[in-house]
Regions:
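Hydrophobic, well-ordered secondary-structure scaffolds
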Residues: 83-89, 106, 119, 127, ...
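A glycine/threonine-rich phosphate-anchoring loop and its flanking beta-alpha core
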Residues: 9, 114-203
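ATP/NTP phosphate-donor binding region
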Residues: 1-100, 189
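Glycine/serine-rich anion-binding loops at beta->alpha junctions
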Residues: 99-118
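Acidic active-site catalytic centers that drive phospho-/nucleotidyl reactions
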Residues: 46, 111, 168
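Short, conserved acidic/polar surface loops in the N-terminal third of protein domains
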Residues: 55, 79-82, 112-115, 137-140
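Glycine-rich nucleotide phosphate-binding loop and flanking beta-alpha elements
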Residues: 25, 50-51, 108-110, 173
Length: 203
């Protein structure tokens, strides 16, 4: 499958979304281009991701000092406590502003990991590797990060753009039907807002 690259630009940030099949193995080269001075990586992993994909990513990152964290992810996980715990752990490993947090999971994990990256030393590098269709087409793009409060969802957060998004469509083969339906619903919503001919193409 051809590798596609989309360039995203905001008033204060530019980054690429790399889309392709079986591109996890090339993660290291993409990271070196977007974060050339990184030495330490906090790899934050959703426990639902099959181990073979985790192994592929870790093999690609073997030249970096990688600290791995696996979590069972749900809405309760998306808390200030867990975001601060991740941030404090990175600080305990002497992360500096050149170092990196990678989120390898769905939207909840990306939101929390990105928020943690935004508050460590006022912002360290963040890369999103979304593992669900919904995250690939929606939550990994746009820089919205945050956690839940006792007063409601996503009330504590920041707009913090990633340095890179790596969307490997091979990951989608491991998803249950419900996860795929959620992703397609978001695609349909976007298509209806943007272009009617794209909406027709979906059917």
């Amino acid at each position: 499958m051809k590798v596609n690259k989309l360039k995203i630009g905001t008033s204060d940030s530019k980054y690429e979304i790399i889309i392709g099949q079986k591109i996890l193995k090339n993660s290291s080269q993409y990271i070196k281009k977007s974060c050339p001075n990184v030495k330490k990586i906090a790899l934050v992993i959703d426990k639902n991701i099959p181990q073979n994909f985790v192994n592929i990513l870790k093999t690609s990152l073997k030249k970096f000092k990688v600290y791995s964290f696996k979590y069972s992810v749900n809405e309760k996980f998306k808390s200030t406590h867990n975001a601060l715990k991740l941030a404090e752990t990175c600080l305990s490993k002497n992360f500096n502003r050149n170092d990196l947090i990678i989120s390898f999971g769905g939207g909840i994990l990306g939101d929390l990991s990105g928020f943690a990256a935004s508050i460590i030393k006022r912002g360290i590098n963040f890369i999103n590797i979304p593992s669900t269709l919904l995250a690939q087409v929606d939550s990994s793009i746009g820089g919205k990060t945050g956690v839940n409060s006792k007063f409601g969802k996503n009330l504590i957060g920041a707009f913090y753009q990633p340095k890179l998004v790596i969307s490997d469509v091979e990951l989608l083969k491991s998803l249950p039907k419900r996860e795929m339906v959620c992703g397609y619903a978001e695609i349909l919503k976007h298509s209806m807002i943007l272009k009617s001919n794209f909406c027709t193409h979906l059917f």
